[in-house]
Amino acid sequence: MTRKGLDIVQGSAGVLIGAPTGVACSVCPGGITYANPVNPVLGAKVLPGETDLALPCPLPFILFRAYSSYRTRTPAPVGVFGPGWKAPFDIRLQIRDEGLILNDSGGRSIHFEPLFPGEISYSRSESLWLARGGVAAQHSSQPLSALWQVLPEDVRLSPHVYLATNSLQGPWWILSWPEPPAYRVLTVVVDGFGRSLTFHRAAEGDVAGAVTGVTDGAGRRFHMALSTQAQRAEASRKQRASSLSSPASPRSVSSSQVFPDTLPAGTEYGADNGIRLEAVWLTHDPAYPDEQPTAPLARYTYTAGGELRAVYDRSGTQVRGFTYDAEHAGRMVAHHYAG
């Protein structure tokens, strides 16, 4: 099945490896998800997308998490939820001399041949178009010619911008660059009416390149509170010191609770900079400019190894929990729901 919408998680249940272009490294992790504890086709643990945040509007920001223990040979860097997990804005396009590799929201790699400016390539197995900017308009014979015109002119004319869509009605996923020409990241989603969902990325500092804010189709603004491994380690040390100084607290702390200041630079799921999403805040709503929430809409905690440990809703209630193999970072061995 193909999921239409804001996330690129789709694909044929039997992609033929070796086809000329638009070829996935595996079958779709979001397809067959029964037969616990693993996907019977991939031989990997797969959890379909779980939605943590979705405020309705014409082009909403839907924050979901999808997990797969499948490891592609050409991975994107580890995302903000840690190894194995992907968020909708973790889509990345690798620009290589021999071709293009689209890392989707399911953790897969979809391979395309290089594109000339203005060229569009279609993957039949994935039902996905990948395009490159560089022309003001597409020829009328191109099925995406009408959808092309809803894009801002600067996007259409830039040969450095790539775009993807899985429908003739949109939306477009606009893949721009922080450091050309090595890769492109998701910066904007544009629907068939020209409305946009914008992902704001830090230009400098410890979290440079990461998404720190989102503006949805209604003009609502969200702040993505991020942390580095060093910051989590420092917070853990302060918490331990506070616990040990309290007469009512135990005098020993398990070594499993000790956070290292750094994480291994490379994992089976790709390079890991240690940046994680701690919380999501609604900071502006045009409909209620003077009434903003005093608590985050969602909050997350992590293990000492940077793996997603727990998810909390806006009431502070833990709604999900996860356990991982101590010998293999990111390999989930158990998960539970609230209650």
Give residue spans per PLM region.
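Nucleotide/phosphate-binding site architecture used for ATP/NTP-dependent chemistry
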Residues: 34, 41-43, 91-92, 132, ...
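Intrinsically disordered, low-complexity segments enriched in small residues
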Residues: 1-72
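N-terminal targeting and processing segments
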Residues: 65-66, 86-90, 123
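Short, polar loop/linker segments at the starts of domains and inter-domain junctions
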Residues: 72-86
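Extended charged/polar low-complexity repeat regions
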Residues: 5-17, 81-83, 98-339
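Short alpha-helical segments and helix-capping/turn motifs at coil-helix boundaries
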Residues: 45-50, 86-88, 94-98
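A structured, charge-rich N-terminal accessory region that forms the first stable segment of a protein
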Residues: 55-56, 93-95, 105
